[in-house]
Amino acid sequence: MVKNKFIKFFALFLLSLLTFSCGTINRLNDSNNNISIEQKIKRYIKLYAPIARKQMKVYKIPASVTMAQGILESGYGESTLAKKGNNHFGIKCHKGWKGKKIFHDDDKENECFRSYNNPLKSYKDHSLFLANRDRYRFLFDLNSKDYKSWAEGLKKAGYATDPEYSKKLISLIERFNLSQLD
């Protein structure tokens, strides 16, 4: 009888310990996920900010906007397009694209996106994509330090279908102080 009570007590103790531990682990994972996303974004900025600044000097596109687009479009470098195709800006193939391709579900199923050998080529193509398309031409009349007008202009020109696109870019720029790159 004492043995049965001990076994029941021990089983109840283990069950309580396990329940408490799982709750604590889940709370730790939740807070680590928030911190880890922030850290991943900061790591992305540290890694790609020099490229964005170089592109700004050549093409006059604010580095803050380029960085915010890269963070948003690539999921801070963690998206399938970024990992498998080095596409950090969600640029689709469009007419005349003769480079590498990757297919991915987006607005439609199995859409064609540009694929690059490395992220640097993605950043350069992003600059060329904006600089060489008529629908973005008006952006280059804006002050290159006016990230808000650039973000709103990208949305107006149809860069993305998300109605909150410019707000998301501006939020990233302000949250991570990306305007210091301009």
Regions found by a protein language model. Name each.
Residues 10-19:
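Bacterial N-terminal signal peptides
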Residues 2-5, 20-182:
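Catalytic cores of secreted/periplasmic lytic hydrolases that degrade extracellular macromolecules
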